[in-house]
């Protein structure tokens, strides 16, 4: 019995295309194959063996370049510790494939589609390759509709498009990941939608916190994992650049299955798209390509386009993508955020100044934009209210220098009124989050779009001029602000 199984393994190995490692430079391997047996670009190679300590090695690599002299250059998807020249590398004959479908919900995967949550293997036969073409023009859906998030500042001033691409821009520590967690929470609870979260090159601690948070809020159901609303794919900061560069594609592939086969609306979160570019830059340098502007890879636009063009709405379903974009040194002209801008339908820009004031979410109401904020899409009432809010805040911004030099008393009566309303608007744009209850001590609030519009209309019209501005801070709808004002008044007497 043992001899027959050994013969089977040997015959299987002979059938496979096996090369051997000739050079290892960090996560990059050069592999030599027999003449006429060269693997294709993006094929995955598997290196198995034992290191000098006798421990098993199993490293998957992706072919990136054909070098000539029957050699290929491949990038490893996991650590290359213990690999040696002369080790065998088996050509699988296909790109990386990952599990897809309902059984991925509630689970955490790595870039290879292997579960890393200690809950056992995925009971699933369906797999998709991570390299796929974008949908054809004829399959695309061009209908415009708003995606309500329950977050006042987003829904009013920079609404998201269903099936669109949204960028969350901000430097370190201004609240991008908290905003993403709130969106996952609101969408799962209010819309019953399925989400896929791609953790690309971020902190492992944040990934773990997000997982625990999702279990607490029942977005991931521990008792009945099949009722979970999200699949998680992580390629964190400690992973090699190959894994960080491809983990976004793994998450996108899982989302595409829900859209194309299950015909559902899906939310794809990528935190952080900058790390995808950064990993591509590292791989590009390791492959010996000449760097482009600011040291980025010359193929920056192509790599970004191949990912972004697959994120779209078809006649079968939609993928709405929300991408956190780390802005290096808060410089929006850096090639990485600038390239990302070109693909987005809406931008949510987070402001360090607002975060310093304690206004959360620290979304900049004047810098954030959306192609959806048009009167024929959102309606006249919404559009006029949003424009009124922006004009009031813009006037307040212009008056701030005068206030700093001369004080409020030197302003005209009209300008003093504008400043008072702008300060109320600024505070009313803050909102307690469900996922931040432990920090703020305030229960989270989901505010519907009609309630949001009504609240800001009342502030703009002057109906609430007699209420103190602190009554508008960290509340949900306008009724809560009025109740808070009454409580403040009662407390002050």
UniProtKB/Swiss-Prot annotation:
A Pfam family: ATP-synt_ab
Entry binding sites for ATP: 170-177
Main location group: plastid
One GO CC annotation: proton-transporting ATP synthase complex
The enzyme's E.C. designation: 7.1.2.2
Catalyses which reaction(s): ATP + H2O + 4 H(+)(in) = ADP + phosphate + 5 H(+)(out)
Location(s) in or outside the cell: Plastid, Chloroplast thylakoid membrane
Subunit structure: F-type ATPases have 2 components, CF(1) - the catalytic core - and CF(0) - the membrane proton channel. CF(1) has five subunits: alpha(3), beta(3), gamma(1), delta(1), epsilon(1). CF(0) has four main subunits: a(1), b(1), b'(1) and c(9-12).
Protein name: ATP synthase subunit beta, chloroplastic
Biological process terms in GO annotation: proton motive force-driven mitochondrial ATP synthesis
Keyword Ion transport listed: yes
Broad enzyme group: translocase
Keyword flag Ribonucleoprotein: no
Function recorded in the entry: Produces ATP from ADP in the presence of a proton gradient across the membrane. The catalytic sites are hosted primarily by the beta subunits.
NCBIfam families from the UniProt entry: atpD
MF terms in GO: ATP binding; ATP hydrolysis activity; proton-transporting ATP synthase activity, rotational mechanism
Keywords: ATP synthesis, ATP-binding, CF(1), Chloroplast, Hydrogen ion transport, Ion transport, Membrane, Nucleotide-binding, Plastid, Thylakoid, Translocase, Transport
Similarity comment: family membership: Belongs to the ATPase alpha/beta chains family.
SMART domains in the cross-refs: AAA
Membrane topology: Peripheral membrane protein
